[in-house]
């Protein structure tokens, strides 16, 4: 790997954001997967509300790109391990990552394809009336604004991607 001043600057800036480490996104594929697994194991000690906020916050700090897959075409969606190990995320990939994190942690949720401001986005509904990935790092209650919900999936609907 060639190290540039930009790479070094990104690492130095992104190590700690809002009192949490984000350096795992600069690890190799195995390191990213191990960091994700270790973080998911910590969720088991939290109550449901805290888990929702922790998942929203953790996924807020991923490396963002414009598009990693087509949210309209389920067959383009990566499995959880491919998603995390690739290490770059579009807004829909953030939602899919939240969904995978919750499902693999045993939290009841469903994935929703929505259109927000004319853009498709994968959201996660949890605890019956809370949405994740509507706004970065936030858990939204009941006020879903102008979102159009087009389709939803339970974990069992996506068994080809993640075993429940």
List PLM regions with ranges.
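A structural boundary/capping signal
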Residues: 1-164
